[in-house]
Amino acid sequence: MSNIYDLANELNRTFRELPEYKAVLESKAAIDADSEAKSLFDDYIAFQGKIQQLMQTGQMPTPELQEEMKSFGEKIQANAIVTEFFTKQQQLSVYLSDIERIVFEPIQDLMK
């Protein structure tokens, strides 16, 4: 039987070979090559971290933060480079969801 860590590392390598993964990498490179897209992306990631911290402490976003979320959504939709990145990332996330379901199935079986 294979070592479980060897299997996990093989999954890591295989995941990186997926066309969808490579498409996300290409989209990220396009963001990095465009100063406007890079600035928007970096600002959004920082804002997203701020919102996650707030939610982890049990707080809800204020109306001002909700308005800022809406504004980011509009800016992202207006920027084709950033929009493409998030579209490609979502396509890749289908694999992650499937893998997560498969990996955690034995743990769920223990709870039955």
Curated annotation (Swiss-Prot):
Pfam families: Com_YlbF. Gene3D superfamilies: YheA/YmcA-like (1.20.1500.10). InterPro entries: Com_YlbF, YheA/YmcA-like_dom_sf. Belongs to the UPF0342 family. This is UPF0342 protein SGO_1370. The lineage of its organism: Bacteria, Bacillati, Bacillota, Bacilli, Lactobacillales.
